[in-house]
Amino acid sequence: MKIGITIDISRLSLFVSGINQNAIYLALLLKEGGNDTYLIHVKDQDTKSLDQTKKLCKKHGLNRLAFNEVSSKKLDVVISLGVTISDVMANAWRNKNPNIKFISYKCGNEFFVDAETYIYKTHQERAASHSKITPVIPDAVWSIPQMENTNLHYYSFILGTENTTVVPFIWDPMLMEAALESNEVSIYDGRKINRIGIMEPNISLMKFCIPPAIIADRVFKNHKDIEIEKLMLIGANGIQNDLKFKELIGKMELYKAGKMSADARHATPFILDKYAHIIVSWQWENPLNYLYLDAAWLGYAVVHNAHLCKDVGYYYEGFDFENGEEVLYNAMKNHAEDSNYLAEQRKNITRYTRMNQNMVKQYNILLQDVVNDEFKRQVYDPLTNSVSPK
């Protein structure tokens, strides 16, 4: 099959943009399944992200395609992921290729983001861009597993179709391996763990830095046998001057001891190599995250509350900061001595990669169902990262 996947490579580095990573990982997986796969991009600017994408496409045998070239390729399926496909554009492509199918691949919590936009007037840039486009009604909507609970039926509502289903989660070690090859990061080497990194973007309640900071502060207060040299709030530079935020941070013993600092968002390899020996994370209704897989694949400890990947890193329950404290304490105390961690983590994470041939086959079946107009809603199994018809 000829498959096109939209990607926006005009702004963010691949190491920071989860959506662009998702597009490339999906393209690699579909290529593994024997499909002729293209990344469809809008802009062709000389940016760091574009350079990264060109190199990775060349290395892994992926094709790039401009939007105005889509009609000539006679694609069987176009997957809208990084860039929304308008109904006008879709109709133009259908005029030249009546059998073309459209899939909307959803990897963001649109319900939360829309609610925050309407109630708190946040995410205004996104709202403005979306208001300019009427998206095509897709032949199917695919949701990543962590969005299923809050968004599956919301996607049906906003896109005007009942053909919405969960699909397996995809990750790939390619970016971490590229960072290793270029010496941007190294495998965790057993060094003493005394620098903590928190990497929540702080643009939505879904990923907010205060809960993991509370967990780290509890360890600092209650466990004097653990040395914490620094707590880095990566991605908190946009809120660090907010009065309420400063009030919350000011209550923390780590802050009073001069051990906290805030910085802009950075790529995971950069943080792991330069600033953090361990990552502490918190999420709400986003229980799978590339950050956890990136860090664990490199052998670093990552403490998180994502229930769909409990066997990745070190898991604590939901909003239970006492449990988080216990888990972080044990990780800081014992991780350096765990010689099996790297191999075990890579074994656990493999189910999310194109090395999982069962997942490769499942995506081919899902594609064929769309082409044949045979929609089937799927049920997700987090232990195997697989789906089966409901």
Locate the predicted segments by residue.
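Short internal beta-strands
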Residues: D36-K43, S104-Y105, W142-S143, E229-G238
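A short, active-site helix/loop in glycosyltransferases that binds the activated sugar's phosphate group
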Residues: F112-S182, Y363
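Extended catalytic core of nucleotide-activated donor transferases of GT-like folds
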Residues: I7-S10, N20-I137, T150, D263-A267
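Donor nucleotide-activated moiety binding/catalytic core segment of transferases
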Residues: L65-F67, N237-L298
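A charged, aromatic-enriched C-terminal amphipathic alpha-helix characteristic of glycosyltransferases
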Residues: H335-P389
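Conserved alpha-helical elements of sugar-nucleotide-dependent glycosyltransferases
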Residues: L14-L29, F208-I215, Q362
